[in-house]
Regions:
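Feature captures the catalytic ectodomains and active-site-proximal regions of enzymes
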Residues: 1-169
Length: 169
């Protein structure tokens, strides 16, 4: 909050992540049923986050289920976790956030955890940012490694630089 002059909140089932949020002055949203696994309360995370945006400028929603499925080496659970995250968190947020005048949404994993190795790796992390003020129409756009490596795609060299890019544009 000091660096950017904004207030933030976060929701996570992971104590380490919540501790980091507390350390930087974020409000911790205590959502019932948040587990860090496939049975987590995805919709609750999104709804509590949207409600928090009435009083804070930024909400960080951490979802652990895809990472846990990767550590277990379970590709079916990882697919389910990503699909649930997309439909129940991202979908809920994108529908609800339209009530706000201007907004930006950043979606990304916190780190890669390939199923093949069952641990975190240091590959680049893909991200997508939606800015309601931009009038580009990318409806139906798809993701591929080829697109990710294309000329003109924003690449952030160091992870700590992403927040500057997201906040300041």
């Amino acid at each position: 909050s000091e660096k950017y002059g904004i207030k933030g909140a976060m929701v996570s089932a992971v104590d380490l992540t919540k501790g980091l949020g507390i350390y930087i002055g974020m409000e911790i949203l205590n959502v019932p049923g948040v587990t860090g696994y496939l049975d987590t309360n995805y919709v609750g995370k999104a709804e509590y986050s949207l409600e928090a945006l009435e009083r804070v400028d930024l909400v960080y929603i951490h979802v652990e289920a895809p990472d846990e499925a990767s550590h277990a080496g379970n590709y079916k659970d990882k697919i389910k976790a990503i699909e649930d995250f997309d439909a129940l968190v991202v979908g809920t947020v994108l529908r609800g956030i339209k009530a706000f005048e201007d907004y930006r949404v950043l979606v990304m994993p916190d780190h890669p955890t390939p199923i093949e190795v069952r641990t975190h790796t240091d590959e680049p992390v893909p991200f997508v940012i939606y800015d309601s003020r931009e009038k580009k129409n990318n409806k139906g756009a798809v993701f591929s490694e080829e697109i990710l490596n294309a000329e003109g795609v924003v690449k952030i060299q160091h992870g700590h630089e992403l927040m500057d890019y997201f906040i300041r544009g």
